[in-house]
A protein has these predicted regions:
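C-terminal-of-GTPase-core extension/linker across diverse P-loop GTPases
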Residues: 1-121, 126, 131
């Protein structure tokens, strides 16, 4: 059972910064919004996870089924990515947070290069190499 207050969610939506939202939630004794709890519960029930792609102009989250391998996840972006999959460069979300940038992760030797059998993990930051 997930209890959600429409008024509380509306109040959160009106706040501009992440910090303001966190302070508001803390004042209510909450760790996260009802919407976030609902989304997490739905993802869990449907066996879904998220990987991330990031470029200079855009960062995007992509939904996939838990247990999918790298080529299948590449296909979520475009079928040509799956057909011509070569490899995936992978940064673990926690490593990105710790080091602060792709360059710093690479310099620390924490960027992985994975093949067709790699099972994508929730939160992985992916860069797919392909040839069609």
């Amino acid at each position: 059972l997930i209890v959600i207050s429409a008024q509380t969610e509306a109040d959160i939506a009106e706040l501009e910064t992440y910090e303001e939202k966190q302070m508001f939630l803390e004042d209510l004794g909450l760790k996260e919004s009802g919407c976030n709890r609902l989304i997490k519960a739905i993802y869990s029930l449907l066996n879904l996870e998220t990987f991330i792609t990031a470029g200079e102009m855009e960062v995007k989250a992509w939904t996939y089924r838990k247990g999918w391998k790298a080529p299948q996840c590449a296909g979520v972006i475009h079928t040509d990515f799956e057909k011509g999959f070569i490899r995936a460069e992978v940064i673990k979300y926690e490593d990105y947070i710790q080091y602060g940038s792709e360059a710093a992760v690479r310099e620390a030797g924490k960027m992985g290069v994975e093949g067709k059998e790699y099972v994508v993990q929730d939160g992985d930051i992916m860069h797919f190499r392909f040839n069609v």
